[in-house]
């Protein structure tokens, strides 16, 4: 950091355009999670590490991250199963029975059944990291979006076939 004398006082010459916080504050306020995106072949879900503010909006922030797409480091090698231009209508609600209700915009209704299954798998992999979430349910316009087999939700263990580690 360069310093310059200005009017008899020392000033930082080229301050960075960022907020600098102590590590203790960051560790207390944020938690590391992974957003999961499919590789270009669609056979593997790859993690994209992010830091999310701790609190009751963790699931909402994770879904917003998925909808924003992968970060720069993996953008070229991944893709999202969530339909483009899909938005989160409200906050993700986690019911007492552990169902994460993900209210998406109506664009999700344009997905084919296969695309919807992959979108649920992508959401499940990402949301399984949140304690208390056991199942995922996508809604659009306030109504559950039907999944393959007439189901309206899926366990967070969905998509185990996409594990690169084979576990």
Task: Write out the residue ranges for each language-model feature.
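Bimodal "functional hotspot" detector
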Residues: 1-167
